[in-house]
From Swiss-Prot:
<keyword id="KW-0460">Magnesium</keyword>
<feature type="binding site">
    <location>
        <position position="231"/>
    </location>
    <ligand>
        <name>Mg(2+)</name>
    </ligand>
</feature>
<dbReference type="Pfam" id="PF12710">
    <property type="entry name" value="HAD"/>
</dbReference>
<comment type="similarity">
    <text>Belongs to the HAD-like hydrolase superfamily. SerB family.</text>
</comment>
<dbReference type="GO" id="GO:0016787">
    <property type="term" value="F:hydrolase activity"/>
</dbReference>
<protein>
    <recommendedName>
        <fullName>Putative hydrolase ML2424</fullName>
        <ecNumber>3.1.-.-</ecNumber>
    </recommendedName>
</protein>
<dbReference type="InterPro" id="IPR023214">
    <property type="entry name" value="HAD_sf"/>
</dbReference>
<dbReference type="InterPro" id="IPR006385">
    <property type="entry name" value="HAD_hydro_SerB1"/>
</dbReference>
<feature type="binding site">
    <location>
        <position position="58"/>
    </location>
    <ligand>
        <name>Mg(2+)</name>
    </ligand>
</feature>
<dbReference type="GO" id="GO:0046872">
    <property type="term" value="F:metal ion binding"/>
</dbReference>
<dbReference type="InterPro" id="IPR036412">
    <property type="entry name" value="HAD-like_sf"/>
</dbReference>
<feature type="active site" description="Nucleophile">
    <location>
        <position position="56"/>
    </location>
</feature>
<feature type="binding site">
    <location>
        <position position="56"/>
    </location>
    <ligand>
        <name>Mg(2+)</name>
    </ligand>
</feature>
<feature type="active site" description="Proton donor">
    <location>
        <position position="58"/>
    </location>
</feature>
<keyword id="KW-0479">Metal-binding</keyword>
<keyword id="KW-0378">Hydrolase</keyword>
<dbReference type="InterPro" id="IPR050582">
    <property type="entry name" value="HAD-like_SerB"/>
</dbReference>
Amino acid sequence: MASPDLSNAYNGRIDLGSLANNASINRALNDMPTAVDDAGVRPQPPIDLTAAAFFDVDNTLVQGSSAVHFGRGLAARDYFTYRDVLGFIYAQAKFQLLGKENSQDVAAGQRKALAFIEGRSVEQLVALGEEIYDEIIADKIWAGTRQLTQIHLDAGQQVWLITATPYELAATIARRLGLTGALGTVAESVDGIFTGRLVDELLHGVGKAHAVRSLAIREGLNLKRCTAYSDSYNDVPMLSLVGTAVAINPDAQLRSLARERGWEIRDFRTARKAARIGVPSALALGGALAAAVSRRRDRE
């Protein structure tokens, strides 16, 4: 089995002027002083200054795709056409049935998302993210993964979400869970309005490793003392960058590699349960979104 190319992630030469995903890191660090969790508590400064934990979001912390859950909330508010809804149904069904993400699917979804937010205000999208977190995403948090984040927090370590999910949504999830922050894909905005373009590359695959490495430099972290968690083989570059890698709800390729490398595996699903709920839950999503579109058509 061939592993993803890690050469870029391990380049020992550091150019502080060209660190990857600066936009995501800058946004996250700028937002940290104002972040408070659901209890209104601001995360405490870390006691252990050189160790941190990095968590992927989709299927690692959140059951399924956080962007699709966000899409469900938007569909319920009549933001989508029938064609858009079919795309969400397909993405969710494929994600649940195959148990892994596809780079092309992620990129295609990102393009659609950028087209959707173009011309909309950042404030509006953040507010929608808050509402949809309460309505849908909060109930999709894997309890086991949530406990792992708390273990690191209790140890006085920074805990970061590292995800291709749009920064605004990722930051909302991190803040509501009392985590240190989130690195996500950053969409460009001018005067508070999204332009429909990205500031940096999609935060996915090797890009996550670049971002973690850059964050470690900024925060003075020792990557050998850090831990990373993911469900996806696409995140092997990030998992390989730290001292401790943990496969959470892993896809088949990651499970095989984790066994080969002696990485810990934690599966908060069961094979029987995953097989049983995969298709029905995808169909339920399709029914819910189709109903939303039908209501919209009736009104039109």
